[in-house]
From Swiss-Prot:
Belongs to the CbiD family. Its EC number is 2.1.1.195. It comes from Edwardsiella ictaluri (strain 93-146). One of its GO terms (molecular function) is cobalt-precorrin-5B C1-methyltransferase activity. This is Cobalt-precorrin-5B C(1)-methyltransferase. Pathway: Cofactor biosynthesis; adenosylcobalamin biosynthesis; cob(II)yrinate a,c-diamide from sirohydrochlorin (anaerobic route): step 6/10. It comes from the Bacteria. One of its GO terms (biological process) is anaerobic cobalamin biosynthetic process.
Length: 379
């Protein structure tokens, strides 16, 4: 289909995973082929582009249509074996030739609109990121030559529905998907792209003037913060498993207070100095619980029961039965200590807080009174 660099699989946990290509590559290819069709006045069914990473893609063209000096073409998004909300959808380009000598780019149906600062695009503009903007304009210029002009519209009929499965709304991108991709290639299980998308949320909130942020592993944490702590969802950012990365990004951006809120099953790993909490990186949950229970003087019988548990929830039942609920305040304080240690070379250390909760939405523990943490968050 394309060059060897693209066809070579990515190996992840012993499995060969197929690469894909970004919405930016789709839009670039669609715009290029539409421009060529408008110029040549004949349908084209295959198009080649060179991605920003230097990989050549040979892509099949769908729905080619020519009407005068206007042409429409679509490329079907292929995310490879990556988990991708836009996989399989058609990305269209409509190119209308003119004599202006300039290339204009706009977003049509299904392409989101930027409504907030912080993602590097003007408010009110189409959510077509800088790299795809450059590649689209370059591809169209290559196709039409140095003197002609063209109006390029990117659209995606499924965009509104697909966008509901993305983080776009949290980023202030409304009404559709984003046209993104810095390399043009989707690498399966790419943690870097995932981390970057999470960090973008931090950047957007900082650009809006926020200086205090709550970091949670996922939706359960966000719901707890909103419903049990009374904190608005705007103050909450998902960190997934990337605790260390997101804390460092928050510090880099100048946040003055960072509050980690989550279930012990995730956050107790941080108490052990584990800042990537996915199980494939490390799992010292029971060992961490046993160590801190021992420091609190827990009997050997409890330590043994906790050691033999398979889940944190099971261990918590034994901890409650033995009356060692004070463990959670102890763990929360240790989590904060670990975060501060990680940031020890930072000039302006933020306030760090941690709150642990159970699956039934009980507050288990915190490094200081929750009311004081909430009061600071509202400053």
């Amino acid at each position: 289909m394309s060059d060897r660099a693209f066809d070579t699989p990515v190996w992840h946990h012993g499995k060969a995973l197929r690469k894909g290509y970004t919405t930016g590559s789709c839009a670039t290819a669609a715009a290029k082929v539409a421009a060529l069709m408008a110029l040549r006045q004949q349908p084209i069914h295959q198009i080649a582009i060179v991605t920003p990473s230097g990989v050549t893609l040979n892509l099949s063209v769908e729905s080619p249509h020519i009407e005068g000096e206007q042409a429409i073409a679509a490329i079907r998004k292929d995310g490879g074996d990556d988990v991708d909300a836009t996989h399989g959808m058609l990305i269209f380009a409509r190119v209308t030739l003119n004599d202006s000598g300039a290339i204009s780019l706009s977003g049509g149906e299904g392409i989101g609109t930027v409504t907030r600062k912080g993602i590097g695009l003007p408010i009110g503009s189409a959510a077509i990121n800088r790299t795809p903007r450059h590649t689209i304009e370059s591809a169209v210029r290559e196709a039409i030559g140095p003197t002609r002009g063209a109006a390029v519209e990117i659209f995606a009929p499924e965009g509104v529905a697909r966008a509901q499965k993305t983080y776009n709304a949290r980023l202030g991108i409304l009404g559709g998907i984003s046209i993104i991709g810095t390399t043009g290639i989707v690498t399966p299980m790419s943690e870097e792209s995932w981390k970057r998308s999470l960090a973008l949320t931090l950047e957007m909130k900082r650009a809006a003037g926020m200086t205090r942020v709550v970091l949670v592993p996922g939706n359960h944490g966000e719901r707890f913060v909103r419903e049990q702590m009374g904190i608005a969802a705007d103050a909450v950012v998902t960190m997934s498993n990337f605790v260390g990365y997101m804390v460092e990004e928050a510090v880099r951006l100048g946040f003055r207070q960072i509050v980690l809120v989550g279930h012990p099953g995730k956050l107790i790993k941080v108490a052990a100095g584990i800042f990537h909490t996915h199980s494939h990186m490390a799992d010292a949950r029971m060992e961490t619980l046993v160590a801190h229970l021992a420091l609190l003087g827990a009997p050997l019988a409890l330590l043994t029961r906790v050691r033999d548990c398979d889940t944190t929830e099971a261990a918590m039942e034994h901890i409650d039965a033995y009356g060692f609920q004070s463990l959670y305040d102890h763990l929360a304080a240790r989590i904060c200590q670990r975060v501060i240690e990680r940031l020890r070379f930072t000039q302006n250390l933020p306030i760090c807080d941690a709150i642990l909760f159970s699956f039934d939405n009980r507050t288990l523990g915190s490094n200081r009174p929750v009311a004081a943490i909430v009061e600071d968050l509202r400053c």
